[in-house]
Amino acid sequence: MKVLFVGGYGNISWWCTKRAIEKGHEVYLLNRDLKTGTRKEIPSEAKIIVSDYRNFEETKDALEPYEFDCVCDFICFNKEHATNAIKLFKDKTKQYIFISSESVYKRTFKGLPYTESSEKYNEDEVSDYIGDKVRCEKAFIEAFEKENFPITIVRPGLTYDTIVPVSIGHNCFTIPQRCLDGKPLLIAGEGNALYTFTHSSDFASAFVELIGNKKAIGEDFHITTQTWRTWNEASNVLLDTLKITNKKIIHIPFDEVLKLDLPMPSDLMYQRMLHNIFDLTKIRKIVPNWEAKVSIEEGYKMTIDWLYESDKHRRFVDNVNQKIEAVTNKYI
C-alpha cells in the first residue's frame, strides 16, 4: 500500500514509519524541515515530499500528483489543522489516521480502566492542548458522518523513544542532566498513581496493523502498554539507568503542583497524579496477538543510549532548568 506520514520521524512516528516499511508499504513522508539534530535519521526507504504543511495551497500543490491508501497525520493539533486535512485528503486517501491523545478522557475517578467509550472532556473546560484535540476529533467525526471521510482516531498514552518521561519538567534532557549534576528529581504528589509508559516501538507494532484495515474506519482506539507502573517506580528506573546511586527525590504536594509555573499545562500535570490505565480490548480485536514487549527498564536504557550517541540529542533548555530550580529551592 502507498502510505503517507505527515511528520513521520518524531518521537512516536519514527517507529511507525519503520514498521510500515518493514511490512512492505511504499512509504512517503511529508515535512517542511528534514533536520535530524534531535531526531532519528529518516529511513532511507522513505520517499520525501517537502512542503510546509501549515501552508494549505503549497501542500495542495505538492500533493497534486499523489493518491494514497492511508494518510497518518502526527502533527494535527487544532480544528484549523483538522479542517485543512479534511479538504486536502478527502479525495486523496482511502483512510486517514488522526493521532489524538488519551488526555481527552475525562478524569472522573470512576470507570477505570478507561475504554474508548469513556466520557470525553468538553473542549472549553480544559487547556488548549487537550481542548484542541477534542475539537479535532469532533471535526473528523462530523466529516465521517456527513461526508464519509475515512477517519480512524488513535490515542497514544505517554509514549517515549527519543524523549525522557519525567513526572515534573519537560521531555528534553534537562531533568536527567540536573540529576547527573546532583540535583533532586521532582515527583508530583505521592507518586503512587498507576501509569502507562509505552515505548514507541511497541506502539508502532499495533498502529501499523490499523493501516489499510477497513474495520478501523470510523473507529477510535487507544494504544498503550498493558503494564502499569507508578511514577515512583519510573523515576527510580530513570535514576538507575543514569547510574545514579545517591538518589535524591522530592515529592511536591498535590495542590502545589497545580500552581507551578512549568511548561506543561496544569490539567496535564493533574492527570499525571491520577491513575492513567486503559482497557486494550478494542485494539486487540483488530490486532489480536499484540502486546507491548519493551519493559520500562529496557526502554529507558534504549532512550538514554540513543541520547548519548550525539551531543545534539541531549537538549538542555535553560528556561526549564530555571523554573525547576526555583521549585526545587522552595522545597529543599
What name fits each language-model region?
Residues 3-23:
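N-terminal Rossmann NAD(P)H-binding glycine-rich loop of SDR-like oxidoreductase domains
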Residues 101-127, 138, 142-147:
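Active-site "gating" loop of Rossmann-like NAD(P)-dependent oxidoreductase/epimerase domains
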Residues 167-175, 188-211, 218-219:
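Substrate-positioning beta->alpha
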